[in-house]
Amino acid sequence: MRNNNLTVHQSDERMFFLERLLLKTSFDVPTHVFAPNINVDVSVLADIEDGARVVLGKCTDEARALAESRDITLYNIMKDERFQAVNSRLTAEGALMLMIEHSVKSISDCNVLVLGFGRMGAAIAKLLNKLDISLDVATTSSLRPAYAFANHVLPMRDFDFSPYDIIINTVPLAVVNDSDLTTMQKGAVYIDLASKPAVNLEYARYLGADADIYPALPAKTCPYSAAKAMQEYISEVIK
């Protein structure tokens, strides 16, 4: 909906709250905001005014070229360090909620494996460590930082999932093969937080795992806080 040159493109509850947070903010040129997980393409950008400003998280190369030709300024929220830090923390909290909802055990009784130790994986490991949850990390990154939170740091290959009640993936690559999946406990909880799953989800479910992918998790678990993080970014970069 439009307000004072602002269009917040509605795609989830987070964007509803963002519109409310920006209700009294005026913009001197047409300004459009898309959810960070929406990949903006040429067909979407074609409807936006020349000279407009667009806040987004992803766009195609063709859309980027079209924006340049029409003097449309793109602001990529996913390149902002502060926003990424907040978004990772909110994602970690959402992952904890999923763990509690899906596990038949108390999380204090669970052995957890986190795949990946980038910004999101580190945020999850830090939160689980604070709760004194038994945790291992698999990563291709430097091992030393992960050892601050994990009992063991493992290579990102030849997985043996048998010790783990919960597996959380943050790597947007198919790093787990079907043979590795057969080591997973029946009834294990697999939470994929990446844009693309690391495993064959259908096969994992066939083997008895509670497996699913949860993109844009903060928009579902804490939509107001996710919107507030976006609002703070917009207020900072668009004066």
Positions of the model-derived regions?
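Residues at the starts of beta-strands that form the adenosine-phosphate
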Residues: N4-N5, D28-P30, N111, S134-D136, ...
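NAD(P)-binding Rossmann-fold cofactor-contacting core
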Residues: F27-D28, L131-F149
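Short, polar loop motifs at secondary-structure junctions
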Residues: D12-M15, N37-V40, K58-R64, A138-R144, ...
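Active-site rim beta-loop-alpha module in soluble metabolic enzymes
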Residues: L127, T139-L143, T170-V175
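Rossmann-fold NAD(P)-binding glycine/threonine-rich loop
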Residues: K58-Y75, L193-I238
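Glycine-rich adenosine-cofactor-binding loop
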Residues: N4-L22, S108-N129
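Glycine/serine-rich phosphate-binding loop and adjoining beta1-alpha1 elements at the start
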Residues: F34-A35, N39-S108, Y233
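Rossmann-like adenosine-cofactor binding region
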Residues: N37-G51, Y147-K220
